[in-house]
Amino acid sequence: MTQNYVYIETFGCQMNVNDSERILTMLADIGYVPTQEPARARLILLNTCSVRAGAEEKVYRRLENLVVLKRHNSRLIIGVGGCVAQQEGEALLERIPKLDLVFGTHNLHLLNDMVLAAERGERKSETSFIDNDQRLDLFPPIRGTARISSFVTVMQGCENYCSYCIVPYVRGPEVSRRSGDILREVRQLADQGVREVALLGQNVNSYGLKSSAEPSFAELIRLVAAVDGIRRIRFFTSHPKDMSPELIACFGDLPALCSQLHLPAQSGSDNVLARMGRGYTREEYLEKVRALRAVRPDIVFTGDMIVGFPGETEEEFQETLSLMEEVRYIDLFSFAYSPRPGTRAAELADDLSRGEKQSRLERLQALQKRTTMEINDVLLGTRQTVLVEREGKRPGQISGKADNGRTVNFSGDRSLIGTFVDLRIIQVFQNSLLGELLPG
């Protein structure tokens, strides 16, 4: 079999990162090995995100740069997958004549055949939905991982249809993977040296809700925690309305379940939440936060916020700031609203100026920056157990993550990668911590 090189760029969420890892596993079966150099590749793939307009345009600009490589390599194949591919379909081939293949979010299992067809000079687009659990059986597990932590997809799709969000339209309805397949993959990862798994889904805590044959998400976490070798569990992304009492109890009962939770609020205003179609009120969200802190006092929250949603008043924006002050997120992904064609919110009057949206975003981010540093300051001098994951950016340093998700850099030998070490935090920064090894 001839060996070719494949270069993948991944945009967007952890689900896309996991999909890209699986794509590399699949392509190995037809002789492709990964490279970090686009100019070296026979095959270049972009795994794309369309959640926000900025991400979508970034993909188009990147494609325009990459097709230039075809001037020097007539054999080069360029493909686009992910949510932009699902949304645009064959229109991508029409917009970019030098593009060779387009594959949607349900069609990864067809990619090898599409690549082989492209090698023969055929241009292909496949974005048809598979509307049942067959789509989760068609995608192979990752093989040969050398990572210490790994993503594990447990469900796909979303049926919340928040008014601003394109995801249900490009990812399709919710489908839960069989728990036996999930546990088999987790055991394989543990046997390969993985010590931390992150369970993934567009709305991960709705796992099993549509199937009486599968455990609930809380029960699934308990099953994963029982796998020998797995010492840490995280999950992304959860919806506040599906944060059940049973799932909250897991944070008090399972030491392996990390003390970091991504719990997107999107707004602190009941009026805005209703227009967004989020399915909960401000107080219901805060009740979940208080319940989680009651069972896990050291828990920290990350989240998402949208400012400038249609109709948002200054008073409603202030309610978002006050929610942030009460929750005290350790990190926050924040964005100015941009309408997505095909969503319900796109039909609302986008009545805030770009300048006002930007002003609110800057005020929100300034508050978050202060809060992050205040939380980090409290960690100064504390003892933290860190899973060492990689070499650091500075010579002689290695890097890992604490239970709370903070990146910690420290001086140490690379032989520590893959182990848990105890560190004392000696310096804090906005996005990372500096530690020193404790004897033990």
Swiss-Prot record:
It comes from the Bacteria. It is found in: Cytoplasm. [4Fe-4S] cluster 2 binds at residues 158, 162, 165. Its cofactor is [4Fe-4S] cluster. Binds 2 [4Fe-4S] clusters. One cluster is coordinated with 3 cysteines and an exchangeable S-adenosyl-L-methionine. It catalyses: N(6)-dimethylallyladenosine(37) in tRNA + (sulfur carrier)-SH + AH2 + 2 S-adenosyl-L-methionine = 2-methylsulfanyl-N(6)-dimethylallyladenosine(37) in tRNA + (sulfur carrier)-H + 5'-deoxyadenosine + L-methionine + A + S-adenosyl-L-homocysteine + 2 H(+). Its EC number is 2.8.4.3. Pfam families: Radical_SAM, TRAM, UPF0004. Residues 4-120 form the MTTase N-terminal domain. Residues 144-374 form the Radical SAM core domain. Residues 377-439 form the TRAM domain. Keywords: 4Fe-4S, Cytoplasm, Iron, Iron-sulfur, Metal-binding, S-adenosyl-L-methionine, Transferase, tRNA processing. PANTHER family: CDK5 REGULATORY SUBUNIT-ASSOCIATED PROTEIN 1 (PTHR43020), MITOCHONDRIAL TRNA METHYLTHIOTRANSFERASE CDK5RAP1 (PTHR43020:SF2). Belongs to the methylthiotransferase family. MiaB subfamily. NCBIfam families: miaB-methiolase, MiaB/RimO family radical SAM methylthiotransferase. Catalyzes the methylthiolation of N6-(dimethylallyl)adenosine (i(6)A), leading to the formation of 2-methylthio-N6-(dimethylallyl)adenosine (ms(2)i(6)A) at position 37 in tRNAs that read codons beginning with uridine. Monomer. This is tRNA-2-methylthio-N(6)-dimethylallyladenosine synthase. It comes from Pelobacter propionicus (strain DSM 2379 / NBRC 103807 / OttBd1).
